């Protein structure tokens, strides 16, 4: 195996401390990350930097590497390498020395199968009105960079322009293939999953594919019937309140709910009778006339009965 100059790869000196080397690693990992860099050899450079960091970040591996680098031009280097404790290794053990020092990036790396990158999930808030049509959205997320030990070393900001299809529902997952973390040893990238969260609406509640809206009406509108303007997701409509309507009554407006590929829901107007403010003398007299005319009506007649 070729003995690479890891210090040159990292752009540091052999005398630099771990903090300096770590700073260089983060800078280069960000620069050559395949999802960020436009350079044609970015992936190869990224793996080379990761390989150098794996060795130089470990005190024992770095010491062994330094000793091997010091003897790299020794004619005996290919036949015998003297470890710090005096133990000798012949050419048969040479590959094992490299494997013990360089870990995943030496002999073992040739034996490891390709591994798929990690998937990433992010939540995307969508307004109810936006579910009616396909729309574009710019999303930003952090792409984790894993070190040789499977730990997150840093996170690289990434921005994508995506299309949110019409008819998305709360909790729906949208897959963006290959936008997760990079694979290992030629494996495919992971995916990015957008998890849709329908933002709460000040007027509408979601019930499956249907919508509910509370419609305030006056006592006389409920009693006599009326036509009132009610908003929907697209436009306002004129809703007919039947005479004798009750509080809590649900009036169905067909086809004004949520839209999906399979079906279109309905809008349900839930009536809420709102009393006027404290009446003046004239208004109180009118209420009294109504009470006298309906003296036989007892709203609590069947109260508590099954």
Curated annotation (Swiss-Prot):
A Pfam family this chain is assigned to: DnaJ
UniProt KW Nuclease keyword: no
Swiss-Prot/TrEMBL keywords: Chaperone, Cytoplasm, DNA-binding
Ranges where the J domain occurs: 5-69
SUPFAM superfamilies attached to this UniProt entry: Chaperone J-domain, HSP40/DnaJ peptide-binding domain
Keyword 4Fe-4S: no
PROSITE patterns in the record: DNAJ_1 (PS00636), DNAJ_2 (PS50076)
InterPro entries: DNA-bd_curved-DNA, DnaJ_C, DnaJ_domain, DnaJ_domain_CS, HSP40/DnaJ_pept-bd, J_dom_sf
Alphabetized GO MF terms: bent DNA binding; unfolded protein binding
Cellular component terms per the entry's GO annotation: cytoplasm; nucleoid
Protein's cellular compartments: Cytoplasm, Nucleoid
BP terms from Gene Ontology: chaperone cofactor-dependent protein refolding; protein refolding
Chief location bin: cytoplasm
PANTHER family listed in its UniProt record: DNAJ HOMOLOG 1, MITOCHONDRIAL-RELATED
Function per UniProt: DNA-binding protein that preferentially recognizes a curved DNA sequence. It is probably a functional analog of DnaJ; displays overlapping activities with DnaJ, but functions under different conditions, probably acting as a molecular chaperone in an adaptive response to environmental stresses other than heat shock. Lacks autonomous chaperone activity; binds native substrates and targets them for recognition by DnaK. Its activity is inhibited by the binding of CbpM.
Name of the protein this chain belongs to: Curved DNA-binding protein
Native species: Escherichia coli O139:H28 (strain E24377A / ETEC)
Gene: cbpA
């Amino acid at each position: 195996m070729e003995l690479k100059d890891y210090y040159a790869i990292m752009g540091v000196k052999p005398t630099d401390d771990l903090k300096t080397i770590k700073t260089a690693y983060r800078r280069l990992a960000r620069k050559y990350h395949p999802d960020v860099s436009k350079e044609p050899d970015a992936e190869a450079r990224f793996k080379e930097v990761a390989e150098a960091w794996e060795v130089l970040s470990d005190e024992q591996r770095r010491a062994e590497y330094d000793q091997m680098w010091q003897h790299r031009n020794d004619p005996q280097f290919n036949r015998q390498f003297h470890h710090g404790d005096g133990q000798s290794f012949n050419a048969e053990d040479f590959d094992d020395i490299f494997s013990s020092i360089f870990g995943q990036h030496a002999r073992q790396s040739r034996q490891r199968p390709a591994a798929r990158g990690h998937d990433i999930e992010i939540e995307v808030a969508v307004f109810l009105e936006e579910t009616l049509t396909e729309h574009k959205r710019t999303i930003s997320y952090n792409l984790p960079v894993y070190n040789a030990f499977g730990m997150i070393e840093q996170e690289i900001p990434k921005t994508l322009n995506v299309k949110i299809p019409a008819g998305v529902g709360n909790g729906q997952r949208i897959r963006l293939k290959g936008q997760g973390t990079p694979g290992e040893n030629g494996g495919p990238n992971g995916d990015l999953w957008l998890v849709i969260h329908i933002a709460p609406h000040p007027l509408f509640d979601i019930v499956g594919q249907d919508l509910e809206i509370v419609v305030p009406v006056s006592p006389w509108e409920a009693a006599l019937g009326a036509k009132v303007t009610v908003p929907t997701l697209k436009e306002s409509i004129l809703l007919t309140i039947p005479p004798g309507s009750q509080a809590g009554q649900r009036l169905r407006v067909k086809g004004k709910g949520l839209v999906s590929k399979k079906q279109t829901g309905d809008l349900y107007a839930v009536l809420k009778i709102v009393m006027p403010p404290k009446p003046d003398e004239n208004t109180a007299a009118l209420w009294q006339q109504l009470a006298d005319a309906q003296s036989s009506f007892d709203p609590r007649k069947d109260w508590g009965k099954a």
